[in-house]
Amino acid sequence: MGNKYFHKILLDGNLCLANKRGYVYMSNELKTPFRYDYVGSFLRPQALKDAKAQLRKNEISKEDYDKIVDEEVAKLVAKQKELGYHVITDGEFRRAFWHLDFMWGFEGVEHENTGGGIQFHGELALLDDTYLVGKLKAKPHPFVEYFKFLKQFEDENTVAKYTIPAPAQTFQQFIIPDNLESTRKFYETNEELIHDIANAYREVIKQFYDAGCRNLQFDDCTWGAVVGDAAKLRYKALGIDLDTVKSQLLEVNNLALEGKPEDLVITSHICRGNYNSTYFSSGAYDSVADYVFARENVNALLLEYDERSGSFEALAKVSPDKKVVLGLITTKSPKLEDKEAVIARIKEASKYVPLERLCLSPQCGFASCEIGNKLTEEEQWAKLRLVKEIAEEVWG
């Protein structure tokens, strides 16, 4: 793009061309998602695991621990750039859980480690109990400060992306059976809760925007949790209408997106759970496509598409204003996919969404929680090399 008449500059997180007189021309070159992309979380390096263990034993101070985290994030970003990726993240290194830590940053939310969790396929995912102790409101969010640290590493070839749980994920957290009694002390109806969650998210989104964030990703397991026969049986046993649930998930997400700045890209990653290489649910997207694919007001969808995800036919419901990132490379196993088989799947998906609106990524993050998935760091990088290699062959 650059030549003797123009030079590249980074303005508010967007790559631009500027001439010698200072006139600026906007470019979409650094608008996520990219042809080869990734979800966001990475395996915690051993130095970080050791530091966390020392912190828990009071062998190092919180200040010393934070310095180590900063160093490891800087190393991760350097690796992301070395691999040729245009998006940088902090790997979620500052979190214990991909979703709960963000919720703890709202007023009215408390958490406690009671040794409980959520049953995944063959394994209990140990999670902190997270519940309401008052009305949910926004306050200066610590994740915004984490983003500011990441943003300093942006350059003319990269843009910082930050991942947070979707509003629907926060809504779902406070209406699960174990939390409903405490939630009803502050919210008589789900609609009241939806209203406050959407307001809080809009405020936090503004905080991110004011800090220079132009690429924000909602991570959303709620849609994956309401697909398949098991979900139908689960909600029927609870006496809850599944279509009402889907409508409320869509409502809270779209309310939170109202009024977002035009130059802020917000995407949504949808999967079915990711903990120590296990999963929470299985099922095709068909039963939620009319909601999230057709009517959720995000710029792009990063969709898990492994063997538990059904066919590509549901992609026909994706609205024409959205891009789709196909999550065809698993992060749950170190085995590398066959390149030609992945290319064939991309070709199959292009029957429903034009190739120019498709991208490629791993199906989920590499470490949605501190424990991480069952592969090594080098196997993690090999997955990303494969994604890039395939994308360059398909799209040039």
Report each predicted region and the residues it spans:
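Domain-level signal for soluble alpha/beta catalytic cores
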Residues: G22-G396
